[in-house]
Each structure stands twice: as structure tokens, then as C-alpha cells.
């Protein structure tokens, strides 16, 4: 597995980001359109910016493994949710222009503060069904533009476990839906001490459906899970990488939840400790 990184890890414009990636010998990037001055899910196509991005990708030999499309799929603000659903078609068309096959999603939360913050209403049947309805809308675009939609079981979202992600896959039975495996996102204050069991069960359920794997870590601070750079936490990386290999994952390992000044140390840690990474 080669290492990759989120474009928003870096400060600067796209050319500056790709220069930094070259200096760190990183060739793969999960990209956010905000890095070229566009909305993540824009309401129009800026062909000049996209054409310039394609030129830079070729110049610096950077490959985009995915685009971010993470709006709140069960947003309490119905008008905002509907706008994002409509504009998602534009993002799919942009993905085609950039030769990107995968768009990442956030399954969402009923929290009024953040789509990444837990709300007890996430556990209701109504929230789950609302997510399914949003997913159904996005799948129409995915089919039209031949895009894979990647969902991520995340402890603060409506799809907050590998079992629920499995249920989504079984509900739709659609090759345009795949999984982002971020082991740290499976953990919460109730299960992190039993992380090996949680991670093994997750791979048993969804290990054959992984399209993208994320590399971040976690610590406990103020009785909460805090996400940190790959080199700095409690995650059993040895187990995660062993399971990615067991399930024949062929994609990249995308560094996540780190500051720009932590990238070099994260690369060093991952490459020196795990032979599967290069």
C-alpha cells in the first residue's frame, strides 16, 4: 500500500500543495475542491479552475484517489440538505472531468452543531430511513456518471458501526457503494478498550467492500475520543494493516487528522514500522 494524504492537510494553493507532496514523495491525494477556491459541493462548474488543476496534476505527477463530498445526509436543515443533493450531480460531473472515480460521503448526524457530532436521534429508525432516501438520490447521479460513493462507519454518525454499514450495502446491493475503512472512527468511549474485537468484527463484515483506507490515530482526552496524527495514539495499527492485507486491499493508506507539520513524522512512523507501506 502506498501512502496518500488529504489535500486540506496543507496550507496554500493547489500548486503549493503538490510541491509539498513531491518533496515528501507522496503521489496520491484525496482532494477537496476548497483547495482551488471552489465550494466542496459547488453549484456551478468552474472549467478554468478544473482545467488548471488537471494541468498541475500532470505537472507534479499527482493522482487523485477521491473527492470529498461530505455534506450532512440527514441534516435538520432540510433546505440545505436538498441543495446539497441537487448540487451533488455537479460534483459527479466534476469528478468525471478530473478522472476521479470515488466521492466520499458523510452519513450525517441530527446534531445542529456539526455533522461530525453525536446526537441521540441518530439511533432512530426515522434517521436511518432518511439517510437511505438521501443515498437513493445520490445513487441516481452515481449511476449516471459512473461514480463510486464511499461511506464511512463513524461513531458520531447515523451509520456508526460496521454492522450498520453492512446493512446499507445489503439494502442497496449496488456496486456503486463502497466502504471507507477508518478504524479509529469505529471507536467510542464504550468500546475503545476492546478495539481489537471491534476492528476484527468490522473487517469480517465489510472487509471485502473497502475502496479507501484512512490512517489516523486516537487518544483519550477529557473523557472523550480525540483524533490525532498516525504516529501519536493508541490505535493497533499492526492489526489494521494485517487485516487490510488479509482482505486483499489494493488501495492507498490515506493519512488524516494531522497538521501540516506532522506529515513528515507520520510518514516516517508508518514506513518504518510497517513493511506493507511504501
Placement of each model-derived feature along the sequence:
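Acidic/histidine-rich catalytic cores of soluble enzymes
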Residues: 2, 29, 67, 133-234
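Charged helix-capping and loop-helix junction motifs
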Residues: 44-51, 81-89, 121-125, 132, ...
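Active-site acidic/histidine proton-transfer and metal-coordination neighborhood
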Residues: 16-19, 58-59, 76-179
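Boundary/entry segment of secreted carbohydrate-active catalytic domains
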Residues: 1-12
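Glycine-rich, proline-tolerant flexible connector loops at the mouths of alpha/beta enzymes
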Residues: 30-54, 107-113
Amino acid at each position: 500500500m502506498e501512502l496518500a494524504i488529504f489535500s486540506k492537510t496543507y496550507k496554500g494553493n493547489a500548486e503549493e500543495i503538490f510541491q509539498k507532496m513531491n518533496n515528501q514523495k507522496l503521489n496520491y491525494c484525496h482532494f477537496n475542491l476548497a483547495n482551488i477556491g471552489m465550494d466542496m459541493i459547488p453549484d456551478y462548474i468552474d472549467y478554468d479552475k478544473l482545467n488548471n488543476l488537471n494541468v498541475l496534476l500532470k505537472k507534479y505527477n499527482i493522482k487523485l484517489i477521491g473527492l470529498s463530498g461530505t455534506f450532512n445526509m440527514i441534516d435538520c436543515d432540510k433546505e440545505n440538505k436538498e441543495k446539497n443533493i441537487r448540487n451533488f450531480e455537479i460534483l459527479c460531473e466534476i469528478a468525471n472531468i478530473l478522472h476521479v472515480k470515488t466521492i466520499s460521503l458523510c452519513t450525517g448526524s441530527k446534531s445542529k452543531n456539526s455533522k461530525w457530532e453525536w446526537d441521540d436521534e441518530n439511533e432512530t429508525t426515522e434517521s436511518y430511513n432518511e439517510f437511505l432516501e438521501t443515498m437513493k438520490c445520490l445513487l441516481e447521479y452515481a449511476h449516471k456518471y459512473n461514480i463510486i460513493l464511499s461511506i464511512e462507519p463513524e461513531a458520531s454518525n447515523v451509520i456508526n458501526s460496521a454492522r450498520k454499514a453492512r446493512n446499507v450495502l445489503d439494502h442497496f446491493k449496488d456496486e456503486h457503494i463502497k466502504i471507507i475503512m477508518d478504524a479509529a472512527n469505529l471507536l467510542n468511549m464504550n468500546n475503545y478498550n476492546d478495539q481489537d474485537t471491534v476492528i476484527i468484527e468490522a473487517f469480517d463484515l465489510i472487509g471485502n467492500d473497502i475502496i479507501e483506507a484512512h490512517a489516523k490515530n486516537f487518544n483519550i482526552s477529557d473523557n472523550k475520543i480525540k483524533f490525532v496524527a498516525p504516529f501519536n495514539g493508541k490505535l493497533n495499527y499492526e492489526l489494521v494493516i494485517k487485516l487490510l492485507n488479509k482482505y486483499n486491499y489494493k488501495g492507498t493508506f490515506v493519512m488524516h487528522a494531522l497538521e501540516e507539520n506532522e506529515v513528515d513524522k507520520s510518514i516516517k512512523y508508518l514506513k518504518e514500522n510497517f513493511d506493507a507501506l511504501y
